[in-house]
Amino acid sequence: MKKVLVLGASGYVGSQLLPLLLEQGYQVTAAARHIDYLKARTEPHDNLSLEYLDLADQAATQALVPDFDLIFFLVHGMAEGHDFIDYELNLARNFVSALGPKNQHVIYLSSLQPQTGDSEHLQARKQTGQLLRKGPVPVTELQAGVIIGPGSAAFEIMRDFVYNLPIMIAPKWVDSKANPIALQNLNHYLLKLAQDTPSESQTFEVGGPDIVSYRNQFAHIAKTADRPLRLWATSLLTPQIASYWLGVVTSVPSNIGRALLAGLKHDFIASSTIIREKYPQKLISFDSMVEQAIHSEGNFVKSNVWGFDKTAFKRWQAGYGYYPKKTGASITSSASLDSLWHVAQQIGSPKQGYFFANALWRTREWLDLLFGGGVPVRQMPEGPTLKVGDKIDSWKVIRCEENQFLSLLFGMKGPGLGRLEITVSDHGDSRELNISAWWHPKGFLGLLYWFAMMPAHLFIFKGMVKAIEKQAKEQMKD
């Protein structure tokens, strides 16, 4: 069986492709820069290994890439900001220079190219494909438009707009057309291509069976979610202006969202006859793919990100944002890892409280009555060290890795689902302490709640990391 390398495995398509490759018996290595995120979302498997890889590191790339028969290139640079084209092409160059005699096939997931016009995102995809084909290994480029599935950036942007905006004013591109493809259908093509070893490079366009305007896509998402849709289109609102709302309305990373929006002013209609004849399958209708995506969004809670916690899964509700809002604070310290962890894991104890602004923490507990909660209940772990399942007041420990990581499930009432994370990292000559809050808002009220709480969060978390570090240093002196 082929040895398979998945580059960009922590991304949307890559993370969902991994279990399918394993089911078919491949020996898979998943590589990503965001290796901690990948580990948290991936279940262990005998045929799966996880590797940290930054393709910008040419030496590391050349050490890893040559050992595989098949390579999925699922990398993009949209999260890097305005200069991502040069960044993305540099990654592709490093990858091509690392290809060796053992490599037989590269599968590159790209974007459809419109007949007229383009954007930086589309240009980057096009130029990356051209660069990959200059290498010594046959490349299959799969050009896809909008992918519909839980976690797809384009889908989640539309879904968040429907759930979070009482009134939607859209650019004229809302009447552009596309034939979105279901994630399930895309995976079928990827898995079939994995079985082939072509002698020369090839390119396929892939799309779904229905050509739908973005206006009608919004309408069906709203209908499926049982939400009202009040949408007006105007030429005064450009995709560039609309992109500035992304950080407020949706939790999809803003740089990725802006890159996608810039390309949506074009029609994206795939001509997929060739690949449909070569790898036949029943294509899922647009209506069905939206229904499947919305109804299965909560499944991602069943992952190590949430400690496979049953309480978190039970509390998930339709309408919660797939991607979370996040805020936090960090500090770099000379204190030891052990001392920082020893102090941090005392969170909520009678001695420490929450390290800083305890009155604000207690005030929020009593405000829970306004959200339909009960009178605050004081709860503490039985033992001297924390373990999964322990209760700290209204919080529940859902993950605990000694001297590294602590995750607490938010137990109070609120329009969303949240968790608090404390991370301690050793960087050799220094340590980093990070405290972050993650919030999956439920609709417009969930967003209002998040932004109303953000000033307090920033104030409290900055004070917390300083207080923990101070105590850790004092402990080292004793």
Annotated model-derived regions:
Residues 153-154, 173-194, 202:
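Substrate-positioning beta->alpha
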Residues 193-256, 267-329, 336:
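Mid/C-terminal beta-alpha module of Rossmann-like enzyme folds, strongest
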